[in-house]
């Protein structure tokens, strides 16, 4: 399962709209870097966030998710309370080709500050804005910068195409826009 290089990512982004908007070079001056890299693409977080709070709910239940436990924030940055969690989404809209799976890894700049970015793999033929999960593992408030890099997408090409893609399976997060909360069907 080879890791796909920059020229492949650029070609797919420009010809097949795999990533929109697409930044064809690494932008790093004065910001947490984003854009095309040697073997991946550093995605940006939008300016919309949902931060968890314990004011109205005593537990998180993925099968019965209560939106009242979230506070919405829009702005140039997001402050995540100590030992807490926030959701965001990518600026970029991704369209994953059928023979490819995408693994998302957090950027080391945030990891070195105790901020962990988690995303499950982007399945073959999935498309949408990626919902990002941020964990602040520190005892201090942590800052996430909008419109800057937060994670790197690594594109892995399968030896053959899968029999059933995310689109074929009518996956529940297909075509998501903005921050998408848990769905259990």
From Swiss-Prot:
Give the organism, scientific name.
Neorickettsia sennetsu (strain ATCC VR-367 / Miyayama)
Q: What is its EC number?
A: 3.5.4.13
Q: Kindly indicate whether the keyword Electron transport belongs to this entry.
A: no
How does this chain assemble? Homotrimer.
Give the UniProt record's GO annotations in the biological process aspect.
Answer: dUMP biosynthetic process; dUTP biosynthetic process
Q: Which domain of life does the UniProt lineage start with?
A: Bacteria
Question: InterPro entries per the record?
Answer: dCTP_deaminase, dUTPase-like_sf, dUTPase_trimeric
Q: Which CDD domains match?
A: trimeric_dUTPase (cd07557)
**Keywords recorded for this protein, A-Z:** Hydrolase, Nucleotide metabolism, Nucleotide-binding
Q: What is the role of the protein in this entry?
A: Catalyzes the deamination of dCTP to dUTP.
Can you tell me which family this protein belongs to? Belongs to the dCTP deaminase family.
Q: What's a Gene Ontology MF term here? A: nucleotide binding
Q: Which HAMAP family match?
A: dCTP_deaminase
Would you tell me the protein name for this molecule?
Answer: dCTP deaminase
The keyword Cytoplasm appears for this protein = no
């Amino acid at each position: 399962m080879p890791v796909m290089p920059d020229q492949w990512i650029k070609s797919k982004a420009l010809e097949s709209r795999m990533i929109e908007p697409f930044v064809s070079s690494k932008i790093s001056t004065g910001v947490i870097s984003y854009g095309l890299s040697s073997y991946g693409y550093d995605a940006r977080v939008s300016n919309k966030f949902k931060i968890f709070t314990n004011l109205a709910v005593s537990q998180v239940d993925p099968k019965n998710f209560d939106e009242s436990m979230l506070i919405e924030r829009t702005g140039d940055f997001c402050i995540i309370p100590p030992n807490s969690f926030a959701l965001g989404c990518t600026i970029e809209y991704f369209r994953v080709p059928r023979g490819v799976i995408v693994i998302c890894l957090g950027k080391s700049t945030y990891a070195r500050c105790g901020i962990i970015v988690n995303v499950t793999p982007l399945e073959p033929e999935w498309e949408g804005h990626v919902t990002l999960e941020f964990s602040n593992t520190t005892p201090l408030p942590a800052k996430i910068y909008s419109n800057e890099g937060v994670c790197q997408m690594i594109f892995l090409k399968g030896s053959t195409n899968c029999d059933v893609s995310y689109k074929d399976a009518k996956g529940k997060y297909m075509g998501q826009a903005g921050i998408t909360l848990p769905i259990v069907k």
